[in-house]
Regions:
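Acidic, low-complexity, intrinsically disordered interaction modules
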Residues: 38-41, 45-48, 103
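Conserved catalytic-core motifs of GNAT/GCN5-like acyltransferases
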Residues: 110-111, 126-142
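A short, internal acetyl-CoA/4′-phosphopantetheine-binding micro-motif in the GNAT/acyltransferase core
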Residues: 73-87
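Conserved acetyl-CoA-binding loop-helix of GNAT-fold acetyltransferases
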Residues: 84-100
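Conserved beta-hairpin
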Residues: 44-64
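A conserved beta-turn-beta hairpin within the catalytic core of GNAT-like acetyltransferases
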Residues: 63-76, 136
Length: 145
């Protein structure tokens, strides 16, 4: 699922349909199971799927979303104004995602700009970071100023 789609879901999802599963200071994580999500493809076909989301709140306001993709992976989106505040790390520390979704054991990252954040998340969750060596090789080729 793209960041644009996750942003749209986050804007429109009703957090009252979920349950608070974790609170850390002024942060809350709300789990919403079996949320009906409609996607329309480029050719106009409509696809309906049911997903599990973890909504991240800061001071009661939606800050981010974590999508559980079947038993394979997770996707994370945080609104730009909430980035670099360690919201995901604080709410998911101590292997919380691994406890919440024990069938998930890895995370992938294809975005060089987010690599270090995703690697940190993988480490605190006990996940394997897929394609880590490929990304590290690409980073090594970037000239330092």
């Amino acid at each position: 699922m793209t960041n644009d789609t996750l942003s749209h879901v986050l804007r429109n999802i009703n957090v009252s349909k979920g349950n608070i599963v974790r609170t850390v200071g002024n942060l809350e994580a709300i789990l919403i199971k079996n949320h009906r999500t409609v996607k329309i493809s480029a050719n106009g076909n409509k696809y309906v799927n049911y997903y599990e989301y973890l909504i991240l709140l800061k001071d009661g306001k939606k800050a981010g979303i974590i999508l559980k993709c079947d038993n394979v992976d997770i996707h994370i989106y945080v609104y730009p104004k909430y980035r670099n505040q360690k919201i995901v790390s604080r709410l998911t520390g101590d292997g919380f995602l691994k406890k919440l979704w024990p069938d998930i054991d890895s995370i992938s990252c294809k975005n060089l700009l987010e690599f270090y954040k995703i690697r940190h998340l993988a480490q605190i969750q006990g996940f394997t970071l897929r394609v880590q060596s490929e990304i590290e090789e690409r980073l090594d080729r970037i000239p330092l100023e």
